């Protein structure tokens, strides 16, 4: 079911629903997908709804309600072939990650326009995805985290203070992560990026820098967002 204003995506309802099901499955399978901006925005709505239903199914003690929620989830996914274990992954791995988060499980980041037709592209990803897998390999996704760490590396290389906006964004990331986990993920990303940039990786130095960075991130003196003025100004009648 589509609630509110939705993009038709140049398809009839059946083809549109099939497309969004496929995109949602790919997102839950790989934690990150690239598509046109419009498709990413619509797939984000579907994915958010599925995660909300899964959280409710996990936390409810009513077996009837749980069965209904599972049926709703299954109706929004293709559960054949490579996706046959997707329900298990949703309930055991993805939804538990967001039990303390009230919403905002996905993120859409704009990319450069597509080369062949200049269509606006974006990346759709699950927030708070682990950077490293259990086998200690780098996971796909979490583009925002990589961009933030790259900004930190550039600041350190140029001996500049960290950008307040970078600290604010890292503060948001840290809200639902343990400090030790965040420290480890930043160190891993630094190691990979410094190698790609052909820069030396001094573990002791980077560890010291990361600890100092996290002190800034968790500091209560972080700059607060300024409230944007309303576009309408109310004035009394003459």
Curated annotation (Swiss-Prot):
Question: Would the keyword DNA-binding be found if you checked this record's keyword annotation?
Answer: no
SS bond list:
none
| Keyword annotations from UniProtKB, A to Z | Mitochondrion, Ribonucleoprotein, Ribosomal protein
Query: In which domain of life is the source organism classified?
Result: Eukaryota
Q: Does the keyword Glycosyltransferase apply?
A: no
What's the main place this protein lives? mitochondrion
What subcellular locations does the record give? Mitochondrion
GO MF, one annotated term: structural constituent of ribosome
Q: Name one GO cellular component term.
A: mitochondrial inner membrane
Q: Report the record's Gene Ontology biological process terms.
A: mitochondrial translation
* PROSITE patterns listed in its UniProt record: RIBOSOMAL_L17 (PS01167)
Concerning its family, UniProt says: Belongs to the bacterial ribosomal protein bL17 family.
State the oligomer form and interacting partners.
Answer: Component of the mitochondrial large ribosomal subunit (mt-LSU). Mature yeast 74S mitochondrial ribosomes consist of a small (37S) and a large (54S) subunit. The 37S small subunit contains a 15S ribosomal RNA (15S mt-rRNA) and 34 different proteins. The 54S large subunit contains a 21S rRNA (21S mt-rRNA) and 46 different proteins.
The role this protein plays is: Component of the mitochondrial ribosome (mitoribosome), a dedicated translation machinery responsible for the synthesis of mitochondrial genome-encoded proteins, including at least some of the essential transmembrane subunits of the mitochondrial respiratory chain. The mitoribosomes are attached to the mitochondrial inner membrane and translation products are cotranslationally integrated into the membrane.
Q: What is this protein called?
A: Large ribosomal subunit protein bL17m
Tell me the organism's taxonomic lineage. Answer: Eukaryota, Fungi, Dikarya, Ascomycota, Saccharomycotina
């Amino acid at each position: 079911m589509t609630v509110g204003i939705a993009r038709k995506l140049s398809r009839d309802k059946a083809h549109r629903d099939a497309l969004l099901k496929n995109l949602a499955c790919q997102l839950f399978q790989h934690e990150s997908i690239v598509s046109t901006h419009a498709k990413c925005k619509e797939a984000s709505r579907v994915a958010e709804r599925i995660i909300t239903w899964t959280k409710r199914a996990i936390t409810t003690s009513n077996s009837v309600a749980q069965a209904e929620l599972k049926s709703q989830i299954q109706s929004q996914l293709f559960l054949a072939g490579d996706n046959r274990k997707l329900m298990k992954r949703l309930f055991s791995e993805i939804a538990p990650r967001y039990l303390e988060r009230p919403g905002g499980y996905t993120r859409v980041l704009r990319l450069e326009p597509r080369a062949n037709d200049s269509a606006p592209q974006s990346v759709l990803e699950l927030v708070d995805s682990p950077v490293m897998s259990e086998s200690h390999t780098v996971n796909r996704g979490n583009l925002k985290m990589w961009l933030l760490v790259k900004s930190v590396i550039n600041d350190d290389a140029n001996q500049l203070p960290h950008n307040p906006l970078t600290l604010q964004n890292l503060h948001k990331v840290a809200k639902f992560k343990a400090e030790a986990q965040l420290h480890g993920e930043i160190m891993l990303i630094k190691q990979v990026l410094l190698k790609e940039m052909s820069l030396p990786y001094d573990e002791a130095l980077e560890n010291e820098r990361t600890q100092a960075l996290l002190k800034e991130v968790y500091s209560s003196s972080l700059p607060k967002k300024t409230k944007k003025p309303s576009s309408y100004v109310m004035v009394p009648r003459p």
